[in-house]
């Protein structure tokens, strides 16, 4: 536990001091919190609505994120951020030294190596999760705000003629997010992912079902 704490502190110091974590990440980041993210949304969205514009937002939730971070992918990402050498080897050993067994009708299976997930309760879990999720927002057209593994994609609609372009660009970003999840063996929980339609002009019709269309 002491060794894990020292390494977690060193990794966080390296990542944050070199600006390697997304500016839109509010989870497990010094000086950032859930409240900061909510205040940012409140300020931005009130300004947009006061200007008589509209907002489309998509909130996404990764299914069991702490349990599904794929170890080979995580190690690849750590290396790409400059965490290499002996530290990288130590982390590889740390991730590979866990096994799981299943008991059924009083019979215990043989041990099976755990190949995904970060150890629950470990002080390393939050920072490793941050590294894994960090590149999700790369190459997107719209800002993706992150609270650890929860994310929100936003687009402002300034006039009705922007509606189709907004839908197309959000679809394009969802395609990129889907590609990211396929590449890194992750999945999003449709029951906890939602579209949001904010307008000062209500009442208004049913918003486009972006998520249901995306998953079809």
PLM region spans:
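Catalytic palm subdomain of template-directed nucleic-acid polymerases
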Residues: 64-81, 152-182
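Hydrophobic alpha-helical membrane-association signature
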Residues: 37, 41, 128-132, 169-173
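Active-site palm subdomain of RNA-directed nucleic acid polymerases
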Residues: 7-25, 55, 126-158
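Short, conserved micro-motifs composed of acidic
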Residues: 106, 160, 172, 187-216
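Eukaryotic intrinsically disordered and solvent-exposed regulatory patches
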Residues: 42-45, 138-139, 182
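Short, charged alpha-helical motifs in flexible N/C-terminal segments and linkers
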Residues: 46-54, 178-196, 203
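Conserved pre-catalytic core of RNA-dependent polymerases
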Residues: 1-119
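Short, conserved phosphate/pyrophosphate- and ester-handling motifs at nucleotide-, phospho-/glycolipid
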Residues: 121, 125
């Amino acid at each position: 536990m002491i060794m894990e704490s020292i390494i977690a502190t060193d990794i966080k110091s390296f990542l944050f001091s070199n600006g390697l974590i997304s500016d839109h990440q509010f989870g497990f980041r010094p000086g950032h919190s859930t409240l900061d993210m909510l205040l940012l949304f409140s300020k931005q969205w009130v300004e947009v609505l006061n200007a008589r514009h509209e907002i489309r937002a998509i909130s996404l939730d990764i299914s069991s994120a702490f349990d599904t971070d794929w170890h080979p992918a995580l190690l690849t990402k750590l290396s790409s951020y400059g965490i290499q050498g002996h530290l990288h080897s130590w982390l590889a050993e740390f991730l590979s030294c866990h096994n799981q067994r299943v008991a059924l009708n009083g019979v215990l299976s043989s041990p099976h190596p755990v190949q995904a997930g970060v150890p629950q309760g470990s002080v390393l879990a939050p920072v490793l999760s941050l590294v894994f999720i960090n590149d999700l927002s790369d190459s997107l057209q719209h800002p993706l705000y992150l609270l650890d593994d929860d994310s929100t994609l936003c687009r402002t609609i300034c006039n009705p003629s922007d509606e189709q372009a907004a839908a197309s660009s959000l679809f394009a970003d969802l395609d990129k997010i889907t590609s990211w999840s396929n590449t890194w063996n992750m999945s999003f929980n449709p029951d906890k992912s939602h579209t949001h339609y904010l307008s000062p002009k209500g009442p208004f019709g049913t918003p486009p079902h972006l998520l249901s269309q995306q998953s079809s």
